[in-house]
Amino acid sequence: LTKEGRKLAVGLALVALLAGGCGASTEGAGGPHPDYAKALAGSPPPLSALHRQANRLLEGGAEAYESRIASLRGYPIVVNVWASWCGPCRFEFPTLQKLSAAYGKRVAFLGVDKQDSEAHARAFLGSDPVPYPSYSDPNQDIGRAIGATGGVPDTAFYDRAGKLVYLKMGPYAKPAELRADVRRYALGEEERSE
């Protein structure tokens, strides 16, 4: 190769390497749309009903939300309060995708979209799909009912009796912290240190 040919080859190799690295990690960013059907097949009927409403934005406000919580008695529940304009929410969604696929046969997951237009909320869910529905909460009625009245994200944990046992206000700094809280508050397990 000539000197110019070598420079071109090195330049193209560098561009290919950099371009390949741009999509290497999906942790904390909208990654490929996962297929949850296999992981969640055989879920108990109340949880299967949630999975059939995967990634949908539901109306009905606090009354519909409370009715859903009541219908899930017998299962621990994790509720993530999010908004399309929230950067930390976008960071947490891939972790919620993984956790809901991993534990979705034993734990109910729900979302609450706070103060969004329907179009923005649906666009967000289109880029970061989850195997559970989210309730639209434009007036913050649901947020007030669970005490999530500040910023977003917030994550609420209910026990099997439908009682709110913990509300994490604000974002999780690391995916491992969110996983540990799901294991602690939803499953009653302590995270083992590695």
Label for each model-derived stretch:
Residues Y75-I77, W82-W85, G151:
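Short pre-active-site segment immediately N-terminal to redox-active cysteine/selenocysteine motifs
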